[in-house]
Amino acid sequence: MCNIAAYVGTKQAAPIIVEMLRKQEGWDSGYYTGIATIHEGKLHMEKDACNLETLLQQTDITKLPGTIGMIHGRSRGADDYRFAHPFISTNGKLAYIANGCGGIFKADKTKFPEVYERLTNLGYRFTSLVEGDYKQLPGGKKVHGSDLKCQNINYYMDNGLGIVDAMEAAYCERGSEIVSLALYTEEPDRITFGRMNYPMFIGIADHGIYMATTPMVFPEDARDITLLPPTSAGQVFMDHYTVKPFKNPPCKVAPLTPVVYRDCYDAVVAALEENDMDHDQIDRLLRPMIPGGDCPPESALDYMILNDLQNQGRLIIKTTQMPGVKEGSIRTQFIASLKK
């Protein structure tokens, strides 16, 4: 699980998305941080294996130019900045970030190396490639799954697909329980998204559109907050967005009905009345409670419930410090608690 924020509009994007990530970093990120914007047809990017505050101290990311951008904080992984998002396509035109995991698709051990071998043989490059005693690829090699997805989108675009259809093709060829965003230099006025089951909310403002993993972090002027549809891809512009459902989705995402929400809300409240919980613990509570599909959207439901509790004034967000990726580094962990 990771955390994402994005913006497209008339204002400078970087300061806006930095503040949105700051408000959610403790839920399930802070080990790695990365940001990308587009300005005058060029990608601007910074990333490292550190929390947001450290990246702010090391770089001037709030000064990155452009009125369109995205930022990413991720959970623990290899101790290497190369595993931080965004990933850049081999042609240098696409920046890609994602949130999620293999989930129900993790058991398929063949598709990943098949896609990697095809792309490698065609000359696509993986900046996250590390060598060691890994079991993911032949020869003990390993690449980040989002790097693979990024280069595969590049491949499908090189073979004639538009970016939305390329996103769908990459999602459906090798399934993952994820959501992702992409910036493309040849379409500098929009953010492309793909969503399987992990959450991506949008909020409308007079000057543009916000996007985030959780609605809890939107600025006060956000309205008409909406969860983007599952098993779909589309694009977000400053004043509207488009959605295209996958023709042959690799899984069925369970629907979030009012009854499901009520039952899950009650379960979370009951659990929090007994003990404080972090985001992962709430996810594990909710996942088996969502019927009607093989790919439950538990993280979206988790954040919807926490957002409602926050709006009701019932939620307390406690913080604790935990070790980061690099020696001596730290990250902040959020813990959900109810007012007694």
Regions found by a protein language model. Name each.
Residues M1-K340:
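Conserved short alpha-helical segments that host acidic/polar catalytic motifs at enzyme active sites
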